[in-house]
Structure formats: C-alpha cells, structure tokens
A protein has these predicted regions:
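Ser/Thr-glycine-rich phosphate-binding loops at phosphate-binding pockets of nucleotides
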Residues: 16, 154, 214-215
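Single conserved hydrophobic/aromatic residue that forms the stacking wall/gate
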Residues: 214-222
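Hydrophobic pocket-lining residues within nucleotide cofactor-binding pockets
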Residues: 11, 40, 156, 218-219
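Nucleotide-state-sensitive switch-loop elements of NTP-binding domains
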Residues: 2-8, 13, 17-121, 128-132
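Phosphate/Mg2+-binding loops and adjacent switch elements
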Residues: 86, 90-180
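C-terminal-of-GTPase-core extension/linker across diverse P-loop GTPases
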Residues: 158-160, 175-213
C-alpha cells in the first residue's frame, strides 16, 4: 500500500522548508514520492517553491480551491484516486494554512482509497516563536497537535525557550480536553542539522486519532 504523510501547521510555520529536507531524504532512499498541495486559494505559492524538487523520483500535484468544502473534498478524493494509479512509494500532503484533519481521515477511509493508501505519519510544524493570541488560535493548534505523531519545532535559535513552548502546547491540548502531554512527541532540532538517522526515526512517528496512538511501520520498509 502507498504510505501517506500529512504535514500540518499554521501559515508560515515552516512546513514547506521541512518538506524540502524530508523529500530529499526520501529520494536518497530511492523512494518515489508525490507531493500533494491541498489549497483553498486560487494560487498556491508553496507549489512554486517546491518546483526544484521535481525529478524522476518526485512529482508535484495540486488540489486548487473554489467552491464549498464538499466540492473541495471531492476534488481531493479524485486527485488521490488518480495518484493511486501511479504506484508511488509515498505521498506527502501539505495543506496551505489551516486544514481539517477529519477530511484527511474521512477521505482515506473511503473506497477505493482505503485499499490503496495507508496513513504513515502526521507531522505538525510549530514555530518556536509561536504566540497564541486567542482561544480560536488555541483550538486550531490543539486540533492539529491532537492528531500528530510528532510535533516538529521550526525556527529554533539560542533564544528558544523549549520548556515554555511545551507548556503552551500542553495548555492548548488541555483546552480541547486532551490530557496527553505533547512532551514525548516533540522533535526540536535546527532543520539544517537533521541527519538521515533523525529522518529514519521521524518516519516511525505515526499518528493519533480518537486519542489512540498508531505507530507507523514505514521505517521498517526502508
């Protein structure tokens, strides 16, 4: 089955930057990869920033916005069906900005996608300098953290207060009634210093759904 990874996070958190490093790692493992940019906007800037990754091991696809949510979800499913026929080793979905993870789970549970795809990992990229301004922002952040197998901290510097950030993330989870701590799911390292061993570990991050932790066996397939 084709493994599917989802990368979530606020606009500007560093999703596309992380994706560059991650996809280059997968290509070094001789895996065929397809990146699906899932966007509600008319023009996807991230798509343009990823063009340099395209080659015989990496393809780029896009689901563009317009219409209502149901229309967008139908486009999402149709695109995944077409991609499933290409027999990629791995598909990576990067939404632009806020994304409803329920759409991700619901779509992959539908036929024929459930026979072709298997969820690998859900990564949430969190800016080390994140400021949570209001409860709406806290709710959106928590909804992403609640599903991720790994929270990857971006834009780390010598001024980063990781303990304070952990407390803020746990506070967001508590806001939606998720009592599980984020601490063991945090990966904090300058993206420039992430090694292949780090990526191998990240590929077994898995995901959480309905407060249950699922562990990906992706690392065993390399």
């Amino acid at each position: 089955m084709i493994k599917v990874d989802l990368i979530t996070g606020f606009l500007g958190a560093g999703k596309t930057t992380f994706l560059h490093y991650y996809v280059n790692y997968l290509k070094r493992q001789n895996l065929s990869v397809c990146i699906l940019e899932n966007d509600y906007g008319a023009i996807n800037v991230d798509m343009m920033l990823l063009r340099d990754l395209e080659d015989d091991k990496c393809s780029l696809e896009m689901v563009s916005g317009s219409g209502d949510a149901c229309c967008h979800q139908r486009r999402f499913k149709t695109k995944l069906i077409a991609m499933g026929m290409q027999k990629y080793d791995r598909v990576i979905i990067e939404p632009s900005g806020v994304f409803d993870t329920d759409e991700f789970f619901d779509t992959l549970c539908e036929d024929p996608l459930s026979s072709w795809y298997e969820i690998g990992n859900i990564f949430t990229i969190v800016d080390a300098n994140l400021n949570i301004f209001d409860n709406e922002m806290k709710y959106i952040l928590a909804s992403e953290l609640a599903c991720c197998g790994r929270a990857i901290i971006s834009k780390i510097s010598c001024k980063t207060n990781l303990n304070l950030l952990k407390n803020n993330l746990n506070d967001a989870l508590n806001y939606i009634g998720d009592s599980d701590k984020i601490d063991d799911r945090i990966f904090a390292k300058d993206f420039n210093n992430i090694t292949d061993d780090d990526f191998k570990m990240l590929m077994s991050s898995g995901y959480r759904n309905a407060c249950l932790l699922y562990t990906s066996d992706a690392a065993d397939e390399l």
